[in-house]
């Protein structure tokens, strides 16, 4: 029997090409997953380093300086240490709720990144209800905190969980009303459409100038949702030891630690998207019309410019929130609830009515 070697070679080359196609397909399937995860991880490490450096400057002391140049690897060293810590469980607590709580808190925050546009056509899910999806997802996180506090079987943990739930409900409503006002101005609930609506007039087209009252309410509500000083009542050290985190150690405690900074980064990015023009360069079009659309140039250059502009605006808000944490005293629980229900809620309602009236009269 005579075997045609050319046919065998053709079959082998075809099988190799098919296997290469499968390998490339698998790689391209994993790239959209690992790219946001790596970016978010690096972002959290940078935020932790910035907070330590800024707080050291405010308190006139030396910040982290040993782990890496300027102490930039200190957060990574602390995270590595937490990975090897023992994971303790409360003897009389509900271990299922105790273990599920941190996962619910961090997963709900991670899902919020799916609707954030980091650049022109650079968003994981451009949904028509993007901002409402973020509000719905973020409202799940306090459930995880309440489960953690209840499952710990500790009075301090349970009080912290109850405070977290009450605080979230109090400030979620004004925040939602501010988002509704922005949606009325943009005629859309999509985060991409909201950014595009602000790009018509450059710097002066930002919703910051069209909604100054809503911006102030959104800023305060975002800080309260992130449980940052002066709104860190759920984990007040002087009153509740560490709040709902009291019984946690090891990787579970690390998840709560990471979740707080992830939530802060999400809030900063949504301030950028809703009020600061998103990825747009925002140079006044009267003076330099060529640069006004520079970040919409297709390719790697335009994508890089859009990401850089978005992150630069977000880190400006981060600087404000970090400075606020290390300069203002903590509020009492009654003051916090009164601020949300008696002050921010009526203001946000009035802002929504004014926005609705102006939109109706402009028709």
From Swiss-Prot:
Class in the EC hierarchy, top level: translocase
Keywords from the named record: Chloroplast, Membrane, NAD, NADP, Plastid, Plastoquinone, Quinone, Thylakoid, Translocase, Transmembrane, Transmembrane helix
InterPro entries tied to this protein: NADH_UbQ_OxRdtase_su1/FPO, NADH_UbQ_OxRdtase_su1_CS
Enzyme Commission identifier(s): 7.1.1.-
Transmembrane region(s): 27-47, 98-118, 127-147, 248-268, 300-320, 336-356
Membrane among keywords: yes
One BP annotation, GO: photosynthesis, light reaction
GO cellular component: a single term: chloroplast thylakoid membrane
Subunit field text: NDH is composed of at least 16 different subunits, 5 of which are encoded in the nucleus.
Protein name: NAD(P)H-quinone oxidoreductase subunit 1, chloroplastic
């Amino acid at each position: 029997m005579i075997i045609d070697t050319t046919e065998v070679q053709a079959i082998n080359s075809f099988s190799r090409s098919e296997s290469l196609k499968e390998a490339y397909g698998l790689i391209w399937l994993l790239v959209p997953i690992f790219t946001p995860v790596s970016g978010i991880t690096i972002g959290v490490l940078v935020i932790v380093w910035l907070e330590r450096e800024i707080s050291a400057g405010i308190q006139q002391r030396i910040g982290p300086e040993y782990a890496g140049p300027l102490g930039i690897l200190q957060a990574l060293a602390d995270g590595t240490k937490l990975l090897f810590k023992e994971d303790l469980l409360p003897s009389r607590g509900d271990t299922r709720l105790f273990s599920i709580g941190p996962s619910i808190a961090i997963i709900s925050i991670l899902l919020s990144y799916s609707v954030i546009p980091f650049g022109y056509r650079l968003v994981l899910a451009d949904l028509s209800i993007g901002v409402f999806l973020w509000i719905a997802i973020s409202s799940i996180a306090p459930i995880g905190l309440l489960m953690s506090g209840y499952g710990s079987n500790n009075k301090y943990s349970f009080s912290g969980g109850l405070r977290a739930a009450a605080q979230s409900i109090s400030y979620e409503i004004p925040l939602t009303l501010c988002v509704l006002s922005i949606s009325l101005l943009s005629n859309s609930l999509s985060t991409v459409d909201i950014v595009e609506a602000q790009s018509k007039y450059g710097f002066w087209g930002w919703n910051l100038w069209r909604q100054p009252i809503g911006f102030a309410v959104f800023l305060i509500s975002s800080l309260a949702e992130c449980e940052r000083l002066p709104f860190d009542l759920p984990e007040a050290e002087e009153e509740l030891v560490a709040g709902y985190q009291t019984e946690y150690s090891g990787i579970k405690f690390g998840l709560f630690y990471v979740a707080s900074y992830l939530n802060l980064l999400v809030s900063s990015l949504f301030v950028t998207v809703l009020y600061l023009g998103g990825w747009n360069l925002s140079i006044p079009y009267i003076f330099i019309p060529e640069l006004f659309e520079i970040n919409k140039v297709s390719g790697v250059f335009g994508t890089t410019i859009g990401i850089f502009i978005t992150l630069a605006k977000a880190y400006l808000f981060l600087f404000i929130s970090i400075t606020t944490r290390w300069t203002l005293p903590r509020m009492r629980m009654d003051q916090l609830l009164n601020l949300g229900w008696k002050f921010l809620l009526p203001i946000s309602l009035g802002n929504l009515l004014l926005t609705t009236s102006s939109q109706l009269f402009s028709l």
